[in-house]
Amino acid sequence: MGGSDHTKTSSQSTLRSLSDEISSLTDVVAGFLESNGHPERSLNSTDSVRLSDAPEDVEAARRRLVTALHEMTLLTMSPFEAVRDILLEVSSLPALHAISHFEIIDHVPLDGEISYAELARKINVPQRRLTRMLRAAMSRSIFQEPRPGYIAHNSLSAAMVHSKWLRYHAASTMENFLPAAPKFVEQIERFGDRETRCTSPAGIAFNTETDCIQYLLSQPKHQQVLVNLMKHTGEISGMGPQHLTEHYDWPKASDQIIVDVGGASGSVSRAIACGVPSVRFVVQDRADAVRQGESETPSELKDRFTFQEYDFFQTQPVKNADVYFLRWILHDWPDEDAVTILRQVALAMGPTSKMLIAERLVLLPGEGDPWDQKIATSMDMFMMAFNGSERTLEHFQSLIENTGEAIEISRVIRRPNGVQYSLIEVARKDSER
């Protein structure tokens, strides 16, 4: 790494030391790109680029470079300017909302340009307002104006062309989270520490006293966004099943069973099945997900897969399975509900059963990669809008203890670099390990 110290913290950083570190890290990243035939990076490019697939040492250097550049920016600005800049970011939200809502991404040619006047006619938006909002987005490096009166894609706006997940994430942020954001304080003042899916900031925003997630899923516009967001989650670097298949010792015998609790259509279980060619799977979820899973499962796996309609707040019908697998389930729910979900699994576990929880582990400030910390705390705000939660390991430990069942964390498999979730294995206290 050219002798650079990648563990340096903000409190130790000075402008000169950061400058030296940035130069060293840039050499590592640029050297990798050049040696592997990547084109010179440019904000004006509209090519699809994924940099997170680099070797682990290069990826670590790249992530540290992003953090060091941010630290350099903060140290170069005055504290007043830095705080003002954070507040000014809010002003870009109306522009991002318009880009998503009016599907402007689709109306700007990927390789070319379009006048503001023609774009305004196409999407039926007043030209002056459209121009002002898009120029606000450009101040955040989204889109570009190659000549006066014309708009074109750049690398950031083109990313939403290439990534369906990013597009649906933008839509969900603007249509589902943004209305809830001003209601966080009101939720605290009205409900205090009462955290249910029916007392959430989003529930206040959408004026519903029911489970707000279920309310949104009942509205066609919101349902389409949420379903497609989940469908394309695999596009996100570090969210795929590779960590599961490479770092956990799954059962392998034909008489062993893995229960995928809330497993949607079973896509993750199918990925696991490729590495354990004999074990059987039971995938449990809502009726529509079960039907989808049955139709998507290839013929060579059908004899090993059972799909079962199941509400995970009710008694678990599969007893003594080898592994009960919960992937990205608990973070959707307040603590009381999460405890109920865990308890239903615990009551079904036999002496040698394991429960495997795949979730993001939130680190304390100053621990780990600042980039990961930013993602984790940001995602926690998204979850808080619906009274869900991203959790620390200690928080998971508390949930497990509160089940009142004789279960405990037996192992934690921390996520490797670039992966966004860890694995928490839970066993019965009287189990043989």
UniProtKB/Swiss-Prot annotation:
Its EC number is 2.1.1.-. The keyword Methyltransferase applies. Keywords: Methyltransferase, S-adenosyl-L-methionine, Transferase. GO terms for molecular function: O-methyltransferase activity. GO terms for biological process: methylation; secondary metabolite biosynthetic process. InterPro entries: COMT-like (IPR016461), O_MeTrfase_dom (IPR001077), SAM-dependent_MTases_sf (IPR029063), WH-like_DNA-bd_sf (IPR036388), WH_DNA-bd_sf (IPR036390). PROSITE patterns: SAM_OMT_II (PS51683). Residues 36-55 are annotated as: Disordered. It comes from the Eukaryota. S-adenosyl-L-methionine binds at residue 285. The active site is at 331 (proton acceptor). Pathway: Secondary metabolite biosynthesis. Belongs to the class I-like SAM-binding methyltransferase superfamily. Cation-independent O-methyltransferase family. COMT subfamily. O-methyltransferase; part of the hps1-dma1 gene cluster that probably mediates the biosynthesis a derivative of cyclopiazonic acid (CPA). The hybrid polyketide synthase-nonribosomal peptide synthetase (PKS-NRPS) nps1 might incorporates acetyl-CoA, malonyl-CoA, and tryptophan (Trp) and utilizes a C-terminal redox-incompetent reductase domain to make and release the tryptophan tetramic acid, cyclo-acetoacetyl-L-tryptophan (c-AATrp), as the first intermediate in the pathway. This is Hps1-dma1 cluster O-methyltransferase. It comes from Dothistroma septosporum (strain NZE10 / CBS 128990) (Red band needle blight fungus). The lineage of its organism: Eukaryota, Fungi, Dikarya, Ascomycota, Pezizomycotina.
